Amino acid sequence: AGPRFIRF
């Protein structure tokens, strides 16, 4: 669970 924009 990192930044919202990194959801691959």
Curated annotation (Swiss-Prot):
A GO cellular component annotation in the UniProt record: extracellular region
Keyword set includes Secreted: yes
GO biological process, any: neuropeptide signaling pathway
Keywords linked to the UniProt accession: Amidation, Neuropeptide, Secreted
Subcellular localization: Secreted
Species, as recorded: Ascaris suum
Family per similarity comment: Belongs to the FARP (FMRFamide related peptide) family.
Record bears the keyword Secreted: yes
Coiled-coil segments: none
Sequence positions bearing Phenylalanine amide: F8
Protein name (Swiss-Prot/TrEMBL): FMRFamide-like neuropeptide AF7
